[in-house]
Structures are given as structure tokens and as C-alpha cells.
């Protein structure tokens, strides 16, 4: 949806009100019918709708390549500061980089102190209830700031904003929030801020259906060593427990030439590692109608670029094809680490989850990957306590984990998400049982992780040095190609460089070693050698 279409759809009408006469957005909704409520907001009120979000439109996704800050908004932030708190996944981290870029293009300055900010945004995650509770707690914590500084703009954005229940709760319980916007219209941040400054009411703009693919958005990247690169948006899998297809929209792929150009620019700027992002990253290109081009093809082109490491996340087993495996086996700057969420080891539970693969199909995929990349590091996600999960089905998860021998796993107790099919399933697994299963799984995860890490002792590994250790400023920290955290003593000048480290001690989640030689360099052919 472009700006013209948005205005045509909404028929935006603005009214002014005296602060003393203000009524909450929820009060106005109760007073007026659904048909005419829009005109009672200074800005157009577009709440999310889960039913609309599930519809996958046939209209062509528009590619907007000419994003720019409107002249009338330049200087809006002069003398003002912004603060963004980010919850959740790497996609949210990247969205924050984009919003920070827009803020700074508007003239705002960043601050890491909420009490100094003129605009505070909470970029939220909806994947689990615990993540949402943290955001509501933070909103309560920020209320005194809003009370003492009425001119402060307080906003909620990200995935939680795409949920009907969340927006209704904010309208009812957190009426001091000034603006709510979702994941599809980040590029409209200048307009939303302008409306919030001009209005006397809460600004709510959440598109239930996906927006355009907007290129050339400004970004303020975190650091100069590693960078996120979005290659696609949305997910069409609709796993029964997952809210993401509703909050992020249908699958939309960026054009390969735009991605390749961005990666080349990052390489020219000196970045050492990029991570390709997508909710279902290996579905990349399946929405193209004019070319046959998938993630394997993209990776095959990116591996020729002079950058040390390329990763991707998160992949779905169903879309992990032979072409991608073939390209990853070429290695070079394509790392030997794959995150491959399995969620359960039981075919029956996988069917209830709507994962669209069986235990046997997942194990066959793992066999293919290991045959092509024998030293690959596989990590995964697992949910325990899914509705109706039996002891036998949980044991199947444990046995699959033992068979694959994952390097590590993100493990969770099932968290029902309102609006998803699984939320309507009868949950007959007691919480005590869920917790006991999680403990048993985590014990196994740690056992296998410790065994795999022990194998590194005496080995020399390539480490990308990211900075000082969080616990000791005299120690440097970085990650291997397989995403293992390594600590070693060395000069600060090595930060941002690739070095060789001999591992002297292995713990469950970290490695300790000693510097072997100077920084590793990457030549013009993308080949790595020790200097």
C-alpha cells in the first residue's frame, strides 16, 4: 500500500479538541459505530485485524526504490532525542536500525537514557506471552516519565502492535501511549510522528495486510563488524502455534540485485560478517513470478563477494532444498552453521503443529546436509508441552535430539498465542509436567553441547573478534564460523579482525584459548588465509 492508496482507503479526517475535553480512544470507540469511528481521531485509526491478516492478497507486491524523507519533515527532530528499546529476534533488531536511521534523517539525536528522550519507542516481540508481559511492565515503568513530561511521545511498534488484543489492552489500560504502529509501515514513521505531534489523540496505524517492499531506507547499524540484511519479509507457513504470519504478513522477497548491492556496499565499508534475515528465509524467491531464483542461487552469488562470512536465519525444514545444500557445501565465506528448527521429534505433534514434515523427513534432510557438509554445526528450536503431547511423544523428541546431536537448542514451554489455531486446542498437559520435560530436555542439550565443545580443545579456530568480554575488560571475545563464543587475551587493536586462536579449555557454552598469530585477512578472491 503506497501513500496515495492509504489516504484513498482511509478518507482521513482531522478534528481538533481541547485537552480538557479529551476522551480516550476506547471511549470514543464505545460511543460510535464501527462505520463512522475514523473521524473521531485526529489521525486515521487503523487497528489490526487477525482475520484480515490471514488473507493472502493476489495483488502484486510493489517495490518502492525511491524512499526519501519529505522536505516538510526535515528538521522535525532538531533539538530532540529518541530512545528505542528492542525486544525479540534479529528482524526486530534490524527494524530498529531502520527506525534509528529515519530518526536521525529527521534531525533527532540518539540517547541511551529514556529520561532524556523526547520520543521513546518500544519495538516489541509477540512470539511468547512472557515477551509481551515484559513490554507491558516497561509501559508501566515509563508512566512517571510521561506524567512529568507531557510532551514526551511514547510509542509501541513491532509485532505486538499487529495483535488485536494488544491494541485493545493499550487503548484501555495504557491511555498515555501516544502512538502505535506495526511492522508493515515503518517507512511511514515521519508521517506517524507528525500526526502524533499535531494530534490530541492516540495515533494508531497498523496495517493488517502487508505493505510494499521499500528499498533505500536509512539505517544506523549497530557496530561496524557484523550486519543484518533483510532478504524477505513475512511467512506463509501458518504453523498452528505461531503468530508470526499474522504479525509479519505474507512472504515478500526483495529483488536479488538490491540484496547483492547492499552486501557489496557493506563489504566496501569493511564489515566482516553479514546475516541474511527472513521469518522463513529459505522460502526466498518463491513469490517471484518473472524469474526462477531461490536462496541457493542468491547464496551462490553472494559467496563471490569479498566479505569474510555469510550466515542466514531462520530456515524452515520444508523449504530446505538440494540446491541450497549444494551451494553451502562450496563453503568459502558461507559458514558451516545452520539453524534448523525442528520443534518436536514426534510426527503426530508435528502434524498438530502444522509443520508439514514428518520426523523421518527431517532426519533425512539432516543426513543430506551432513553428507555434503560433514562438520556442520546444527542448532534448533524445540517446544515442549504442546497441547496433548504425551510422554511417549516427548521421548521421541529426546531420541531425535540424541540422533542429530545438535550443537545447541533454544527450548521453550508452549505458550498459547491468541488468534492461532493451537490456542483453541484443549491443553491437557499440566504445567508441572511441562516444566519437568523442559528440564529433561535442557539437561540433554547441555550434555551434548559439553561433549561437542570438548572436541575443540587443542584445535585452532578462526575467531571474528567483536569486543571485550562482558565479564573481564582485559579479555577479548569473538565467535567462530560455527558461532561458538571464544575468549582470549589480546590487544584491543584486534577488535573487528579475524584471528586464529588455539583452544585450551572448553566449557558448555564458551571456549577459552590463546592467540596463535596476527589477524587473518581476506584476499580479493574471498579466500581466507592466516597472516
Swiss-Prot record:
Q: Which residues form the TRAM domain?
A: 454-517
Question: Which stretches make up the MTTase N-terminal domain?
Answer: 80-198
Q: What GO molecular function terms would the record report?
A: 4 iron, 4 sulfur cluster binding; metal ion binding; N6-isopentenyladenosine methylthiotransferase activity
Positions of [4Fe-4S] cluster 2 binding: 235, 239, 242
Annotated Radical SAM core domain residues: 221-451
Q: Which UniProt keywords apply?
A: 4Fe-4S, Cytoplasm, Iron, Iron-sulfur, Metal-binding, S-adenosyl-L-methionine, Transferase, tRNA processing
The primary location reported for this protein is cytoplasm
How, per the record, is the cofactor bound? Answer: Binds 2 [4Fe-4S] clusters. One cluster is coordinated with 3 cysteines and an exchangeable S-adenosyl-L-methionine.
> Which compartments is it annotated to reside in?
Cytoplasm
Query: What PROSITE patterns does the record tag this protein with?
Result: MTTASE_N, MTTASE_RADICAL, RADICAL_SAM, TRAM
Which Gene3D superfamilies would you find in this protein's record? Methylthiotransferase, N-terminal domain, tm_1862 like domain
Top-rank EC class of the record's enzyme:
transferase
Cofactor(s) the protein needs: [4Fe-4S] cluster
Q: Gene Ontology terms, cellular component aspect?
A: cytosol
EC number(s) on file: 2.8.4.3
Please give the family membership noted in the entry: Belongs to the methylthiotransferase family. MiaB subfamily.
What's the protein name?
A: tRNA-2-methylthio-N(6)-dimethylallyladenosine synthase
Recorded source organism is Geobacillus kaustophilus (strain HTA426)
